[in-house]
Amino acid sequence: MLHKKCPSCGNERIDGFFTINNAPIFSLVTVKSKEEALAVPRKNIELGFCNHCGFIFNRLFDTSIDYFSAGYEDQQAFSRTFMEYLKRISEGLIEKYDLKDKTIIEIGCGKGDFLNQLVQINGGKGIGIDPAYEVGRQNNPNLKFYKQFYAFEHGKIPAELICCRHTLEHIHQTEEFLQLIRDSLGERT
C-alpha cells in the first residue's frame, strides 16, 4: 500500500525519491545461521519527501507488521568514536538547557546508552521509556526504565527535558505520536 499523506503533517504533496526492492524488514537483528538470515521477510521501500514539512518516510511502510523481533541489537556503546559523539551531544544539551542535576526523560531510549551518558554528565536522574528496553542493560541507580510504549500517563512524570532520539523513524503515525506527547504534558512547555 502506498501512503499518500505525510504521517507527520497530513500533507498530500509527497515526492518519492528513493526506492529499494526486496529489503529485509528487520534491521539490527542478530541471527544464528545463513539460512535464518535468508529467511527474513522482505518488502520494498520507497522514501517520500513531504513538500510541506520536510519529513522523510517510507511510503510503503506496512503497518500490519511488527518490526521488532527477538535478537534486536542496536548497541553502539562499544565504539569509542560513537561514545565521544554521544558525550559531545550530551554536554551540549546539558549546557544549552541548564540541565545540571535535573531529570531527563528519553522516549524511545533503546538500551539506555544516551540517557545513561546524559545522567552521568549532569548528575541528575533519567527516565527511559521504550518497549524494546532490555532490563538489566544499564547499571546506574539514577536511571529508571519503563518497558512500554509512551502513554498519556507518562506526561505526568516531572522532568526538565523530554527528548526523542532515533525514535520517529519507528513510528508511522508521527503527527499523532507528537500530539500525544504534547497533550500529555498539559500546560507544561
Region spans (language model):
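Short, conserved clusters of charged catalytic residues that mark active-site
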Residues: 1, 88, 176
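N-terminal juxtadomain amphipathic helix
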Residues: 1-78
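Generic detection of long, well-ordered alpha-helical segments
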Residues: 3, 43, 47, 79, ...
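Charged/polar, solvent-exposed surface patches and flexible loops
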Residues: 16, 70, 84, 88, ...
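Helix N-cap and loop-to-helix transition residues
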Residues: 32-33, 79, 151, 173
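Short, structured secondary-structure boundary patches
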Residues: 37, 80-82, 148
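Conserved SAM-binding loop and adjacent beta-strand
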Residues: 75-89
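Conserved SAM-binding loop
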Residues: 91-189
